[in-house]
């Protein structure tokens, strides 16, 4: 029973459509009708600006972290934190409060790792920032960090680097989260191939993307 409640709470936490609600309540803007139509951090930054984007990022990360820490907070020591965190990502991606159309799972996945393996998250964040600097694309940075996450979760424990030993639940979760993130970025990948992906005004844009101007 406790397990079902934890899963449900994590899913509902994850389901909070931060960007969508911030847009509606504070700016009177429906994010689905602007930019990429996505309700995650990137589109929130692009359409509503820095404050709203930062708030969305932090809250979306916090959703994952809080969900991951739920078993600890309620003293359910036999429940795996990472498994509960996973349901927050599921909620974030398919939110019950927003017609099951959610974000691309990046921020909330980061939040889950922050609660479970913070140093490992720091490593992936470094990969993300480096890729972002070299190519100026949030999508490519997310995809690269996801692929590196899968490779590293399979190899690091062998070297006892950042991850002490193999944790099959963490491994499965990372692989599934990476798969969700990659699947949610299909459109971005097409644009990267066509060299028309949206850029951020930072970094080197090494792959010379030339996005069409925004409508």
Swiss-Prot record:
Transmembrane spans: 3-23, 42-61, 68-90, 110-130, 134-154, 162-182
Metabolic or biological pathway, per its Swiss-Prot or TrEMBL entry: Lipid metabolism; phospholipid metabolism
Catalytic reaction equation(s): an acyl phosphate + sn-glycerol 3-phosphate = a 1-acyl-sn-glycero-3-phosphate + phosphate
Keyword Cell membrane: yes
Quaternary context: Probably interacts with PlsX.
Pfam families assigned: G3P_acyltransf
Keyword rRNA processing: no
Membrane topology classification: Multi-pass membrane protein
Location(s), subcellular: Cell membrane
Task performed by this protein: Catalyzes the transfer of an acyl group from acyl-phosphate (acyl-PO(4)) to glycerol-3-phosphate (G3P) to form lysophosphatidic acid (LPA). This enzyme utilizes acyl-phosphate as fatty acyl donor, but not acyl-CoA or acyl-ACP.
Family, similarity comment: Belongs to the PlsY family.
Recorded GO CC terms: plasma membrane
EC number in record: 2.3.1.275
Enzyme class (EC, first level): transferase
Name listed for the protein in its UniProt record: Glycerol-3-phosphate acyltransferase
Gene this chain is encoded by: plsY
GO molecular function terms listed in the Swiss-Prot or TrEMBL record: acyl-phosphate glycerol-3-phosphate acyltransferase activity
Main location group: membrane
HAMAP family: PlsY
Keywords, comma-separated and alphabetical: Cell membrane, Lipid biosynthesis, Lipid metabolism, Membrane, Phospholipid biosynthesis, Phospholipid metabolism, Transferase, Transmembrane, Transmembrane helix
UniProt record, GO biological process: phospholipid biosynthetic process
InterPro entries for the chain: G3P_acylTferase_PlsY
